[in-house]
From Swiss-Prot:
May initiate with G9P the virion concomitant assembly-budding process, by interacting with the packaging signal of the viral genome. The assembly-budding takes place at the host inner membrane. In turn, G7P and G9P are present at the end of the filamentous virion that emerges first from the bacterial host. Keywords: Host membrane, Membrane, Transmembrane, Transmembrane helix, Virion. This is Tail virion protein G7P. The gene is VII. The chain crosses the membrane at residues 7-29. Coiled coil: none annotated. Belongs to the inovirus G7P protein family.
Length: 38
């Protein structure tokens, strides 16, 4: 079993990656929408 610190760091890293990808997707959608409106 991993230590408490390892488990916290691992779960935080995974959640952080999901949040980063979600934000990037939202930004890409906003930029695409701006270009489509022209």
């Amino acid at each position: 079993m991993p230590s408490q610190e390892d488990a916290v760091a691992w779960s935080t890293g995974c959640c952080g990656l999901v949040i980063v990808w979600f934000v990037l997707g939202r930004l890409a959608g906003s930029v695409a929408g701006m270009f489509n409106d022209r």
